[in-house]
UniProtKB/Swiss-Prot annotation:
It comes from the Eukaryota. This is B3 domain-containing protein Os01g0723500. Residues 18-121, 289-381 bind DNA. GO terms for cellular component: nucleus. The lineage of its organism: Eukaryota, Viridiplantae, Streptophyta, Embryophyta, Tracheophyta.
Length: 402
């Protein structure tokens, strides 16, 4: 096992005695893994009022791999036995587990497990001890990629003046992916543009006049200054105004609001189902509610509504500031407004963006005090990628944004 000298210390180096079990990977281990019946006495079903006494029940658990990376899995009890189910196939895939290898599990309490993987020679899989997540390199068909090509692919795409471009899946009539180019234009003093810390990730959506059918032009930065002055700091920079930025080319779902647009990759149906299963497997003796994040919750509007039955029973009937404690322990103050639709308002946007919430993610709001929630986040896609903010800007050739 790796020891000192720069290598990761084994997570098993602990003097505390904790329950263990091991499993040889055979049969349908890629889909689910059975937990030994005699070990199930350590699983705290009795702490869940809904699961206690039921023949079939589920609960969420955390599985830590050899590298320290964690996976969310579901423990499901059925008539056949108790299994790791949803989330387990992802662990198998990410750790590149193979038949006849075996895994030793240690139970750390509070539905947390730590896993150690051994190969067919009965030796520990030291390739999984690295901090990068433990994935084995996957070979692809075709010519091998050079190191330079790999680095270039990892870099964000940029235009001719070095501005990062965000590519959307929607395409204009020309068939090319729609790209929105980051602009360094800043509004005049006293304008109504929002000025806060969120503007750092803000991208303008340029609206070109309908009569503009000319090819892409390069406009000197100084020409875009509202006062017609020289270019800022005398820098000889140019900005490219592409016709594919015309407002008509942007999907209605994007241009209808001054909100945020996701930059995550395409999401598979199985990933959405996994997040749903894990979130609904959550159990706690405290009051809680499970809410799927919609576009209104995380991209625009930013009003998060509670189920009426939950809020009327557990929350005050007057405006009050409540505390949201995210999975990292950070505390957020959010305004709660009771009305016909009880909701979180001011401060919710900061929480949603600060935690990179996306449509389809699940939040479990666990009420730990009169006005304090512990928020558990179950994501559709890991790792989280911050969304980008859009604001509408009309550009007339030779004149500044209006």
């Amino acid at each position: 096992m790796p020891g000192a000298g720069g290598k990761k210390k084994s997570p098993w180096a602990s003097g505390e005695r904790r329950p263990h079990f091991f499993k040889v990977l055979v049969g349908d281990f890629k889909q689910r893994l059975k937990i030994p019946p005699n070990f199930c006495k350590h699983i705290p079903w009795e702490e869940s009022r809904k699961a206690k006494g039921l023949k079939e029940a589920s609960m969420a658990a955390t599985l830590e791999g050899p590298s320290g990376r964690t996976w969310l899995v579901v423990i499901r009890r059925t008539a056949e036995g108790t299994f790791f189910t949803s989330g387990w196939p992802k662990f198998v895939q990410d750790q590149a587990l193979r038949e006849l290898e075996f895994v030793v599990f240690r139970y750390d309490g509070n539905t947390r497990f730590t896993a150690m993987v051994f190969d067919r020679t009965a030796c520990e899989r030291e390739d999984l001890m690295g901090g990068g997540g433990g994935d084995r390199p996957r070979k692809k068909r075709g010519r091998p990629r050079t190191a330079a090509a790999s680095r270039d692919a990892a870099r964000p795409k940029k235009d001719s003046v070095g501005k990062e471009m965000v590519t959307y899946r929607a395409s204009p009539s020309g068939g090319q992916p729609l790209q929105i180019v980051d602009s360094s234009w800043t509004p005049e003093p006293g304008s109504t543009a929002v000025k806060n810390e969120e503007d750092a990730d803000e991208l303008p959506v340029c609206e070109l006049p309908a009569s503009s059918a000319s090819p892409p032009r390069h406009v000197p930065e100084g020409a875009l200054d509202a006062d017609g002055g020289a270019a800022r700091r005398g820098a000889a920079k140019t900005r490219s105004l592409q016709d594919d930025l015309a407002l008509a080319s942007i999907p209605p779902s994007i241009r209808r609001y001054k909100g945020y647009v996701s930059r995550r990759r395409a999401v598979a149906t199985a990933e959405r189902q996994r997040a749903t299963e894990i979130a609904h497997a959550f159990r706690s003796p405290l009051p809680y509610c499970v809410i799927r994040m919609s576009t209104m919750h995380v991209y625009y509007s930013f009003m998060m509504r509670f189920p009426t039955g939950f809020s009327r029973q557990h929350l005050p009937r007057e405006r009050t500031d409540v505390v949201l404690r995210d999975p990292g322990g950070k505390v957020w103050s959010v305004l709660y407004i009771p009305n016909t639709r009880d909701r979180l308002s001011r401060g919710w946007c900061a929480f949603a963006r600060g935690n990179c919430l996306e449509e389809g993610d699940y939040c479990v709001f666990e009420l730990v005090a009169a006005a304090e929630f512990r928020v558990h986040i179950f994501r559709v896609v890991e790792p989280a990628v911050p969304a980008v903010r859009l604001r509408r800007v009309t550009v007339t050739c030779g004149r500044g944004p209006t």
